Amino acid sequence: MESPDEKWFRERLRHFLEIRHPPRQFHHVMIERRSRLAFESYAQSVELGVPAASAVRAADKVLFRGLLFSKYDTVHLILTTDFPAIPENQRQEIALRLVRICAPIFRAYDLKDDFSERPEFRQLKEELRTGIRSWIDENGVPGYHSPARKEKPPVPYSEHPRYPKRNKRK
């Protein structure tokens, strides 16, 4: 294994945030601080004689602390499993919007790194499913037809308004 440096930790964190916490991927100060602290943790561990793989695991705890549970991931997973007809290229944008819309639901829970392993996680997912389904039924999603959404039926062509023909200029 190549010996990690601060840049290595920075790139790992940046990639992790891009996938699991898209809004945080541009928090450069946080990324710099965490990658520096993770590298320092790694270097101290190696200096004490800890094997490199164990030193990386210790540094990862510093690098990813407080980031292991992802609201975005949870919402995106629900969209993927419960609404597979929503086009893939729209899911990220919709998930980002729904994370903000579902903020009151998330606030009711103590979301720590191990939250997805606790029994309350199942309850959170059910509340989110209900909230997301309700939002989609009310607002719609381009490219996805919700069975519960009351959409106006398309107007037959014969009933379209007729516009008078324009006089051609000579």
Protein language model regions, located:
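C-terminal alpha-helical interaction appendages
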Residues: M1-K170
